[in-house]
């Protein structure tokens, strides 16, 4: 019967999730948009609060080829008289959110950035994520005391099983895995490393992912490899792009061989980053 409904896999999965939440009588359900917001299946939800973290170039084929167009689509989750928390800081985009929030009579909040919280997720972008989460807690007036907030932030991986966010696999040299898979995430991650770092990179075969190479610092060394997926970007395509933009690069047939060479080329005080796709993680987790 499901086949006759004409629903997508995501729509069916979302409906099942909502039913499950209802049967379990959860206090709060955190529902993440699949694509954009305005036309997403999840936008049927009547929320107590809406959250927009940041605006990147993900899925611009569907959402629009400018940040303003993408922001407009994401602002589609702002509901009438429902508060919204916005992590995005660029003034040009803030104007879009302010305009739509005013039209919907929705209170809008741009969180203050906190740097004094510790978390077991140690990526350079976690301060922003934590600040957004704290603002949501405040807006909902949840009875969570400071002690429990501090404790929860130190146990995110334990409580959620979330891995692959600035995950330190080994030391001397420092081996890091970070599943940065879009231009904005990669830029933040790479800017956190010192010159001369070795970057093992593999990704899916998507135009935006290949374009990511354009923001790669020329002061680093790149080890390109395929990912464990039928949709992997070919190493030849990555290397051709790297050659055009004058990166220092090497090509490999597997993540294992790329990583082995990166290790061989690194001194004990240097960094090795494996990034580009979550599909790489299953290969290197065995090294723990």
Residue ranges of predicted features:
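ATP-dependent carboxylate-amine ligase catalytic core
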Residues: 1-45, 63
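Short, high-confidence coil segments that cap the C-terminus of an alpha-helix
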Residues: 7, 25-27, 194, 267-270
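Phosphate- and divalent-cation-binding pockets in alpha/beta enzyme and binding domains
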Residues: 20, 38, 93-96, 185-188, ...
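Nucleotide phosphate-binding/pyrophosphate-handling subdomain across enzymes
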Residues: 23-33, 41-51, 56-59, 69, ...
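Conserved catalytic-core segment of NTP-binding enzymes
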Residues: 35-39, 46-105
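Short, surface-exposed connector motifs at secondary-structure boundaries
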Residues: 76-84, 193-197, 218-221, 268
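C-terminal helical cap/extension that packs against the catalytic core
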Residues: 89-109, 174-177, 210-271
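Active-site-proximal loop/hinge segments that shape catalytic or ion-binding/gating pockets
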Residues: 277
